[in-house]
Amino acid sequence: MDDCVHKTVGSAARTERTALAVRAVLEGRRRGASMLLPFAGPAVVVSVAYMDPGNLATNIQAGARYGYALLWVVLLANVVAMLFQSLSAKLGIVTGRNLAELCRERFSRPVALAMWVVSEIAAMATDLAAFLGGAIGLSLLFRMPLLGGMVVTAIVTYGLLLLEDAGFRPLELAIGALVGIIGLSYLAELFITPIAWSSVLAHTVSPRFPDANALLIAVGIVGATVMPHALFLHSGLTQRRTPARTERERAVLLKFSNIEVVVALAIAGLINMAMVIMAAGAFHHGHPEVAEIETAYHTLAPLLGIGAAGVFLLSLIASGISSSVVGTMAGQIIMQGFVEFRIPLWLRRAVTMAPSFAVVALGVNVTQALVLSQVVLSLALPLPMAALLWFTCSREVMGAYKNRVFIAVIATLAACAVLAFNAVLILQTFGVDIPGLPG
């Protein structure tokens, strides 16, 4: 009991030290490279949304089927992600409100309630992909039933979520550690996998599609670029982390927030590119049909050894657990923001896990369930994306910090492109033929 109390006090102290360090930077009492560290956290947490098992499956398919040819798509998608996450962070810092709260305050009640329902369903779909991904990794690594992997994943994610009771810093550090595991795992894979680095560089900067089918894979990559829950979450993480007391402090917070977004999502982008590179090096010549996580694991072991396959599963487990935690955090922000209601953590976790257990208990094909979850996310994306653009372009909401014309135009064009790609993904999933695209 005393140990638990000591750990809780220690965790709370970390949060307090971080808040004091941020305040010291804002007041000009802390300088040098170390002044960046207290601001690291929100974007690191959000970056997990771009490294979830859904991204992993898409990247494996891209690398196995087309080698390095679609690396430029991953790079471009990551730049778009940086733009929208910076807007979400700015919204929270400038207004002191998160995206869900502003939707409730600015839109009619029926519209806000409809957005809440859709966003909650999207949060559950996010958790479905993340939770099942972590469970699959555990079941393959430890040779346990999938249901057993799900139980372990549930316990670990709930334990991590309890860290939030001690303040924001302990959970930020825990998720940062999981991101580090994912990154180091793929760094190790790059040393194990035979890679043609000259081709990697060439395809990263050469935008072209090898054939018409490659466009569909690109649609999957871009379609997962901006996740609905990430837009809600980032504004929620920044809104009260360190409130600005003056306009100067607000400007400093925005500067460091933008730096963190660029660094955190650049790391996420490099990890996504590493996923494609690993799949290309391991599967493209000889096994281009690999498209599922389980198949990738079973194919990787005889090709590169059990060590490479084990590292692959370790990254999958870290990805699934961290993504599941982040999805639950986003769901809580969505509920509090839209309907001003908070449920106990254990109940929130149970509700978000229920679809995953139902999928396994009913014998539903896991891959089909993951595909359906991505369709749900695509359907849920337009409303929060449009709301974010509307609010950040509004002088009434943002004051002097509203988007500049150049940023507004670029963000609008990027949003239209992402939504178009999502529409194609949805239509293709339901077997609708699109002129000019393969069926």
Curated annotation (Swiss-Prot):
Sorted UniProt keywords: Cell inner membrane, Cell membrane, Ion transport, Membrane, Symport, Transmembrane, Transmembrane helix, Transport
Subcellular location(s) per record: Cell inner membrane
InterPro entries the record matches: NRAMP_fam
GO molecular-function term, one example from the UniProt record: manganese ion transmembrane transporter activity
Ranges that cross the membrane: 32-52, 67-87, 121-141, 144-164, 173-193, 214-234, 261-281, 301-321, 350-370, 371-391, 406-426
Domain of life according to the entry: Bacteria
GO cellular component: plasma membrane
Membrane topology (UniProt): Multi-pass membrane protein
GO BP: any one term: iron ion transmembrane transport
Principal cellular location given in the protein's record: membrane
UniProt entry tagged with the keyword Phosphoprotein: no
NCBIfam families recorded: nramp, Nramp_1, PRK00701.1
Family that this chain belongs to: Belongs to the NRAMP family.
Classification via HAMAP family: NRAMP (MF_00221)
Function: H(+)-stimulated, divalent metal cation uptake system.
Protein name: Divalent metal cation transporter MntH
Protein's gene: mntH
